[in-house]
Curated annotation (Swiss-Prot):
Gene that this sequence comes from: CDC42
Modified residues ((Microbial infection) O-AMP-tyrosine): Y32
Protein name as annotated: Cell division control protein 42 homolog
Residues modified to Cysteine methyl ester: C188
Function, as annotated: Plasma membrane-associated small GTPase which cycles between an active GTP-bound and an inactive GDP-bound state. In active state binds to a variety of effector proteins to regulate cellular responses. Involved in epithelial cell polarization processes. Regulates the bipolar attachment of spindle microtubules to kinetochores before chromosome congression in metaphase. Regulates cell migration. In neurons, plays a role in the extension and maintenance of the formation of filopodia, thin and actin-rich surface projections.
Phosphotyrosine PTM sites in chain numbering: Y64
Amino acid sequence: MQTIKCVVVGDGAVGKTCLLISYTTNKFPSEYVPTVFDNYAVTVMIGGEPYTLGLFDTAGQEDYDRLRPLSYPQTDVFLVCFSVVSPSSFENVKEKWVPEITHHCPKTPFLLVGTQIDLRDDPSTIEKLAKNKQKPITPETAEKLARDLKAVKYVECSALTQKGLKNVFDEAILAALEPPEPKKSRRCVLL
C-alpha cells in the first residue's frame, strides 16, 4: 500500500491539531494543548486503491524552529495553515512558513489552508479584530496569496463544524499524487 506523507505547518494556535483530530476521529478536541510533534495515519481509497495518508502535526511555536524541519524529509505534500481570523498568522505564511518549507523541500507541493472559518462571522471575534483595525481574511485575499506563493491551491475549513474539512485532505492527496514531474524527485530530502 502506498503511503502519502502530509506535514501540517503554521503558527501556534491556528488549529492544526484540531484539523487533524477532527478529520481522523470526527471529534473536536475541547482544550488547547500545544503540539511538539504528533502523527496520525488514515487509510483512504483513491480510484479503488487503498493509500495510507500519514499526517504529521508540527509545533508552530518559535521554540521548535530547529526541531520542526526534522519531520520534513520524504514529505509528499505540505498543508500551510493560518487562521482566517488571525491576520498575523496569515502574514506569517509569507514571512515564515512558505520560506521554511521551500528552503528544506523546494520541489514539494503545498496547499494554503485557511482554518477556523466558523469564526469569520462570529460577532465577538469580528469585534476583537475591529479594535485593532483588522478584519477576517477573505477567501479572495487568501487565493491571491496562494497564487503569488505558487501553492497548488487555497482551501479552507472549520474543524469545529467540519465544513470543508474532507476537501482539504482530498486536495492534499491529489496534490501529492498528481505528477507535474517524476514523483521520486518531488519528495523532500535533507542533505
